[in-house]
């Protein structure tokens, strides 16, 4: 079977249309089936540095689905191929054993304390 690249589109979470984007992700990542891919998410002390990170997966034509919560917790039904981690003001999502159905948009999200009030 021929291997083919999978494109994982990474979208930065914005807290409302009026808010400045505060988390930074690379525009895309790709890999071939079976590979391990890591997606980074960079923030600051007011968001990732002091709050937990969630990750969402949006498959084409569907609503976003919670993939990882509280930095590294998987909801029931999410395969253990997906794992999350956080260190300082950065977080990452790792997908091991990449599969064709993983081709999707991935969002990182964290509350930003500077948006209060």
Swiss-Prot record:
Residues 20-117 form the Ig-like domain. It comes from the Eukaryota. Residues 109-117 are annotated as: Complementarity-determining-3. Residues 20-44 are annotated as: Framework-1. Residues 53-69 are annotated as: Framework-2. Disulfide bonds join 41-108. Residues 73-108 are annotated as: Framework-3. Residues 24-45 are annotated as: Disordered. It is found in: Secreted; Cell membrane. Residues 45-52 are annotated as: Complementarity-determining-1. GO terms for molecular function: antigen binding. Keywords: Adaptive immunity, Cell membrane, Disulfide bond, Immunity, Immunoglobulin, Immunoglobulin domain, Membrane, Pyrrolidone carboxylic acid, Secreted, Signal. Residues 70-72 are annotated as: Complementarity-determining-2. Residues 24-35 have a biased composition (Polar residues). The modification Pyrrolidone carboxylic acid is found at residue 20. The keyword Secreted applies. Pfam families: V-set (PF07686). Residues 1-19 form the signal peptide. Immunoglobulins are composed of two identical heavy chains and two identical light chains; disulfide-linked. This is Immunoglobulin lambda variable 1-44. It comes from Homo sapiens.
């Amino acid at each position: 079977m021929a291997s083919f690249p999978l494109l994982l589109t990474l979208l930065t979470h914005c807290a409302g249309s009026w808010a400045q984007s505060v988390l930074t992700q690379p525009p895309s990542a790709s890999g071939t089936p079976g590979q391990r891919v890591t997606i980074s998410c960079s923030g600051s002390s007011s968001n990732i540095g002091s709050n937990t990170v969630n990750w969402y997966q949006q498959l084409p034509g569907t609503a976003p689905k919670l993939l990882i919560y509280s930095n590294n917790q998987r909801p029931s039904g999410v395969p253990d191929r997906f794992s999350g981690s956080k260190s300082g003001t950065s977080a990452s999502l790792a997908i091991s054993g990449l599969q064709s159905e993983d081709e999707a948009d991935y969002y990182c999200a964290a509350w930003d304390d500077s948006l209060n009030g």
